A protein has these predicted regions:
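Amphipathic alpha-helical segments
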Residues: 3-25
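Intrinsically disordered, low-complexity regulatory regions enriched in serine/threonine/proline
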Residues: 1-6, 32-180
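A short acidic/basic microdomain associated with nuclease active sites
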Residues: 22-34
Length: 180
């Protein structure tokens, strides 16, 4: 990732707004993680190959999937893309627009934290499924119903152990239920 002015502005705003919430930056990327035990809330300030600037993507990454990469498994709405592209024109303009994206990301992080409670997660998943019928993410949501099954817990613990071994993820929280 180029360390250009747009990236520096994003990082500073995230440092001011997201990091105090306990969200951490994955390495030096534009990816920010909120560790919620069985899932990460993933906030991405996605660059474009065509112009300096950013999109905002936010979604959950479920740890029972045992992936060795961060994926966007479950969005707040129908898509992971929360906000369209802001093109960098100058520092003042970009900071003024990006702060709204960082504030939106912080609101979604706080919302998703409510899903740490399994009853809340199940209720939300049911409402989400009714709203977005025939969505391919139905299997992800059905797994919430089996969150305390031994096999699901084993997968979560194994995946958390994998991510904890990565230097870029050393700020993960500890959870008695989900850590080895």
């Amino acid at each position: 990732m180029r360390n250009d002015a747009s990236t520096q502005i994003i990082k500073q705003l995230c440092k001011d707004i997201l990091l105090p919430l306990g969200v951490f930056q994955k390495g030096t990327s534009r990816l920010y993680i909120d560790d919620n035990g069985y899932f990460f809330t993933v906030v991405e300030f996605q660059p474009s190959a065509r112009a300096k600037g950013t999109y905002l993507n936010v979604a959950l990454h479920f740890l029972w999937n045992e992936r060795d990469y961060i994926s966007f498994d479950f969005p707040f709405g129908a898509n992971i893309r929360v906000k369209n592209f802001i093109e960098y024109q100058n520092d003042e303009q970009f900071a003024r627009e990006v702060i709204k994206y960082v504030q939106e990301a912080s609101e979604q992080v706080l919302f998703y934290r409510k899903l740490q409670d399994i009853a809340t997660a199940k209720s939300y998943a049911k409402r989400w499924l009714r709203k977005y019928k025939a969505n391919p993410r139905i299997d992800e949501l059905n797994t919430i119903n089996h969150l305390h099954d031994k096999e699901v817990l084993r997968k979560i613990k194994q995946t958390r152990s994998f991510w904890r071994s990565k230097p870029s993820m050393n700020k993960m929280k500890s959870y008695d239920t989900f850590d080895v």
